[in-house]
Amino acid sequence: MLRAVARCCGHWPPGAAAADGMLWQTELRPHAAGEFSMAAAQANLAMEDQAQVLASPAATLVGVYDGHGGADASRFLRSRLFPHVQRFEKEQGGMSTEVIRRAFGAAEEEFLQQVRQAWRQRPKMAAVGSCCLLGAISGDTLYVANLGDSRAVLGRRVVGGGVAVAERLTDEHNAASEEVRRELTALNPDDAQIVVHARGAWRVKGIIQVSRTIGDVYLKKQEYSMDPVFRNVGPPIPLKRPALSAEPSIQVRKLKPNDLFLIFASDGLWEHLSDDAAVQIVFKNPRTGIANRLVKAALKEATRKREVSFRDLKTIEKGVRRHFHDDISVIVVYLDRHRGRRHTRVVDSSSNCTNAPVDIYSSNSGQSVETLQAHRGSGW
């Protein structure tokens, strides 16, 4: 059991590198209820997205972690979230919303400890965070938990027809939403700056668009943002209470025969494709390479908006690419079999884990991740 979790939190399997060295995909792989497909595209100098699937005969875990301010928090989640889920699931004897809530809380607390330990040497760690999207399929029950603006969408067949419709399964915690702005204002009635329109978007404290994350300690604990050490990172930020939350939104539903597939993806995909467009692509095309097809559809839309060709995009280096699109991570999970068994365990001795590369460019170019991390001075 522990070896399976260790494999999941370690190296990625060999994937199919596209001609574009910033793309990655892997072949179709089995999970408890069918098959899944994964793909990713790098835009940032350091890949800030991370994605993984842990599959056993009993159940499936899916994780998409969209980092910001650096890759530390998303890489941390890649290595630590699933073990926390596994630990609490074992303690409680099955999957539940409480297991997921405790796993998110434990991950947040553990990352805070990492920030404390690195504070004097790397104060920038306090300004690093990540969105966190978790899916768990246990028997015929689906759990989806979310912090931030990554998204899970269900493709569902219309009863009596050959048409698929999209159903969004996540609440997005982004200040672009009027509901989120109202929530922030209600929680902070004495803070006129809790949500500000700055640099073309609504932002919490005029800084960050997402309102719930793992990390971003400087917007949760004033002792970090007001410490003189933090002045090397940014201006002091007075806080009467945490501006951001790590409390996930959790949805639970019973899977039905008309539920065809799930799409889990970072907002790098959704800023270019609608829920319905993504569902139609998956519904109308072969399974092989389907996640990569979604990534390429988003990239083509991004290039159309920027009035450059997709061929030209392939020549643009990492870092510069961020002006055209964000990092993109996509996992498509097909729902072929709905087992009615209850209290199934998430991890067992025959579990298999698939991770997207920590950094696509270094993976495709042959540069070791260890070398890349040493060059950046990363702690992960």
Curated annotation (Swiss-Prot):
Keywords: Hydrolase, Magnesium, Manganese, Metal-binding, Protein phosphatase. Its EC number is 3.1.3.16. Induction: By benzothiadiazole (BTH). Pfam families: PP2C (PF00481). Mn(2+) 2 binds at D66, D267, D326. PROSITE patterns: PPM_1, PPM_2. Mn(2+) 1 binds at D66, G67. One of its GO terms (molecular function) is metal ion binding. Coiled coil: none annotated. It is an enzyme of class 3 (hydrolase). The keyword Magnesium applies. It catalyses: O-phospho-L-seryl-[protein] + H2O = L-seryl-[protein] + phosphate; O-phospho-L-threonyl-[protein] + H2O = L-threonyl-[protein] + phosphate. Gene3D superfamilies: PPM-type phosphatase domain (3.60.40.10). Residues 32-335 form the PPM-type phosphatase domain. Binds 2 magnesium or manganese ions per subunit. SMART domains: PP2Cc (SM00332). Its cofactor is Mg(2+); Mn(2+). InterPro entries: PP2C (IPR015655), PP2C_BS (IPR000222), PPM-type-like_dom_sf (IPR036457), PPM-type_phosphatase-like_dom (IPR001932). The keyword RNA-binding does not apply. Belongs to the PP2C family. PANTHER family: PROTEIN PHOSPHATASE. This is Probable protein phosphatase 2C 34. It comes from Oryza sativa subsp. indica.
